[in-house]
Structure formats: structure tokens, C-alpha cells
Curated annotation (Swiss-Prot):
It is found in: Cell inner membrane. Pfam families: Na_H_antiport_1. It comes from Paramagnetospirillum magneticum (strain ATCC 700264 / AMB-1). This is Na(+)/H(+) antiporter NhaA. Na(+)/H(+) antiporter that extrudes sodium in exchange for external protons. The gene is nhaA. It comes from the Bacteria. It is a multi-pass membrane protein. The lineage of its organism: Bacteria, Pseudomonadati, Pseudomonadota, Alphaproteobacteria, Rhodospirillales. GO terms for biological process: regulation of pH. GO terms for molecular function: sodium:proton antiporter activity.
Length: 383
């Protein structure tokens, strides 16, 4: 029986994520060039400039990225309720692969950093997959990669994003403010009431959601979690013009072509001036790079292969084992989410932040190159 074709919404999502990934590559490369040019002083000064009481970098990471997480939440809700993750048979393979792809990189990192109190808090940095970057690489490879593997990678990355949100909420939360948390709970109750009352206009949700972000910012829980929480309250119906679909389609180009590239430009810049090989081989950048390059592929491919071998899940249609491995390697492109978690873990420590960037850039770049080489040498098992 032929596999079910992805919906037009899902195809649009794949296309926008892939195009956004290519733009992200360009802006990240531009940030590296500027950070190592005579313009580096102006670049870093601009990121630390104050605006409305916070630095530009802080505003991007806490403000714009909340919109990114809002889109992530909308995608998760859509896929779980009516898309590629709407039943258990569709969830098993990407779900198990995502779990393996989070656990093994963390173990690789901890193997090198467990005895270092200064660096151990970065254990979650190599557990992430950048869906835009990975799909951008697949887009450059053209039709040699089966659509089923693109859907598998997208579903895995969406589950991975959900895991990252849980990690941020549970392990990277500052000192809690109980009055602010009470305000968060009250605002969430109001959003839930709007949903129960079947309010279909987006403006009430967005206005109340802005208040949720402000309360979350004061609560000690990272403000980007507000984006996920807001997304869960946006109504989704069967029709194409439901509030969730309208908001997702409205946000997708702004996030893919604007917010994510801006984040990459602001966070990928690291100066290599005076960077010695001994610093690159320290446990923090090495643990991140090896976690992304080896931990991800071992965790994703090993878990997926075992699930298929044991009969728990079916191999993506038209995909060979080598192609599945190639996509597993691409999951080591952590970039956006890895840099974001690294900023949460070491944001106040410039030296550690630079080490994180070096590890993320090295692990992500090597994963992209190796994964591409594997897939370039593969042919579909059906051909």
C-alpha cells in the first residue's frame, strides 16, 4: 500500500524550513567572518548595547526566540493532533530515535565533563537537532533523499524540540519568583478559558500571550517557555483556516527567514584570535563536538535500527539502511537549539560561551559534511 502523502501544510513547512536553513547557513558564516574581521569590535559592541533595559543579544535570545518557540509549539500541536505524529505507529520510530539522540550525546559529553563542576552544566548542549539547518542540507542534496526520510527527520526534530523545551524548563531555570508564577498560572487559566469559549480571533490570545511572556520573564522560568505554553492554547480545528493554522502560516516565514537567521547571526560569531589548539581540545568544546558528531548518530541510528530489527517500527518507505544512517548523522547539526541552550548554561561566562560556540560549530559542520557525503553515495533501496 502506498504511503500516505504529506499534507500541503506539511509540504509547505518542509519547504520553508529548508529554505530558512540555507539562509541560516549564510548568516552564521557571515557572523564568523565579521567576528574575525576589523568589524569585530562593532559587532560585539552592538550585541551588548542596551535597549529597553536589556542588551540586544538578550532581547534576541529571550524575546525573538519566544516567537520561535511559539511556532515550534504550534507545529508540535498540529503534528500530534492531526499530522505525522497523530497515532502511535507514526510516533514510535522518530520518538525512540529522538530519545536515543538525546541520551547518547549527553552521555558522551558527561564522559568528558562529569568531574568538572564548571562545565558539567552544558550536558544538554549536544542533545539538540536544528531542523531548519538539517532540512536545508537535505534540500541541497535534491531528490536523492526519499520524502519518507525527510518526514522522519522532521518528526524526530519536532520531538527533539519538545525534549529541549522540557530540559530548559526543568534544568535551566533561575531562582523562582512565586508571585510571578502565580501570575503565570492565572494568565494560562485565562488563555485556557478563551480556548474553551471557542474564541477564534487570534488577537486576544496574542495580547494575553504577551502578558504571559512578561510574567514568565519575571518568574525565573525561561521566557521562551511562554511561546510553547501559548501555542498549546491556540484552537485547532479540522478546517484549513483554524486559528492555529492561520497563526502558523503567518509566523513561519517571519521565523524561518527572519528570527532564526538573526539568532544565528547574533550567536554564531566567535573570534578565533588567539585561539590555541589546546583550548579547542578542552573538555567543554570537545564534549559538545563529539556529542553532536558521534553521540547523535549512534543514538539516533542505533535506536532506530534496533526498533526496526525488533519489529517495533517500520523502516521509512523507500529508504535504505545507509540512507537512514546518513540522516542520523545529519541529526548532529545542533546549531540553533544547541547555541541557545549553551547561552542559557554559560551566558555570563564569555570564555565558556566561546568554547560552546566552537564545539557547536565544529560538531554541526562535521555532521553536515559527513551526513551529506553518506547520502551522496547512497541510492534509494527502491531503485
Amino acid at each position: 500500500m502506498a504511503a500516505e502523502k504529506p499534507s500541503s501544510i506539511f509540504r509547505d513547512f518542509l519547504d520553508s524550513e529548508a529554505a530558512g536553513g540555507v539562509i541560516l547557513m549564510v548568516t552564521a558564516a557571515l557572523a564568523l567572518v565579521i567576528a574575525n574581521s576589523p568589524l569585530s569590535g562593532a559587532y560585539f559592541a552592538f550585541l551588548q548595547a542596551k535597549f529597553l533595559g536589556m542588551s540586544v543579544l538578550h532581547g534576541i535570545n529571550d524575546g525573538l526566540m519566544a516567537v520561535f518557540f511559539l511556532l515550534v509549539g504550534l507545529e508540535i500541536k498540529r503534528e500530534v493532533l492531526g499530522g505525522q505524529l497523530s497515532n502511535w505507529s507514526q510516533r514510535i520510530l522518530p520518538g525512540l530515535a529522538a530519545l536515543g539522540g538525546m541520551v547518547v550525546p549527553a552521555l558522551v559529553f558527561l564522559a568528558l565533563n562529569a568531574k568538572s563542576p564548571e562545565t558539567v552544566r552544558g550536558w544538554a548542549v549536544p542533545t539538540a537537532t536544528d531542523i531548519a539547518f538539517a532540512l536545508g542540507v537535505l534540500a541541497l542534496l535534491g531528490p536523492r533523499v526519499p520524502a519518507s526520510l525527510k518526514i522522519f527527520l522532521t518528526a524526530l526534530a519536532i520531538i527533539d524540540d519538545l525534549g529541549a523545551v522540557l530540559v530548559i524548563a526543568l534544568f535551566y531555570t533561575a531562582k523562582l519568583s512565586w508571585p510571578a508564577l502565580v501570575a503565570v498560572a492565572a494568565i494560562l487559566a485565562l488563555l485556557a478559558a478563551l480556548n474553551r469559549l471557542r474564541v477564534r480571533s487570534l488577537w486576544p490570545y496574542l495580547l494575553v500571550g504577551a502578558g504571559l511572556w512578561g510574567a514568565m520573564l519575571q518568574s525565573g522560568v525561561h521566557a521562551t517557555v511562554a511561546g510553547i505554553a501559548l501555542a498549546l492554547t491556540i484552537p485547532m480545528g479540522d478546517e484549513q483556516h483554524s486559528p492555529l493554522h492561520r497563526l502558523e502560516h503567518g509566523l513561519a516565514p517571519w521565523v524561518g527567514y527572519g528570527i532564526v537567521p538573526i539568532f544565528g547571526f547574533a550567536n554564531a560569531g566567535v573570534s578565533f584570535a588567539g585561539l590555541e589548539p589546546s583550548r579547542v581540545l578542552q573538555s567543554l568544546p570537545l564534549g559538545i563536538a563529539l556529542g553532536l558528531l558521534f553521540g547523535k548518530q549512534i543514538g539516533v541510528f542505533g535506536t532506530a535500527w534496533m526498533a526496526i530489527w525488533l519489529g517495533f517500527a517500520a523502516r521509512p518507505e523507500g529508504a535504505g539502511t545507509a540512507q537512514l544512517y546518513g540522516v542520523a548523522v545529519l541529526c548532529g547539526i545542533g546549531f540553533t537549539m544547541s547555541l541557545f541552550i549553551g547561552a542559557l548554561a554559560f551566558g555570563e561566562l564569555p570564555a565558556s560561551s566561546d568554547a560552546v560556540k566552537v564545539g557547536v560549530l565544529a560538531g554541526s559542520a562535521l555532521s553536515a559534511i559527513l551526513g551529506s557525503l553518506v547520502l551522496l553515495r547512497c541510492r534509494s533501496s527502491s531503485s
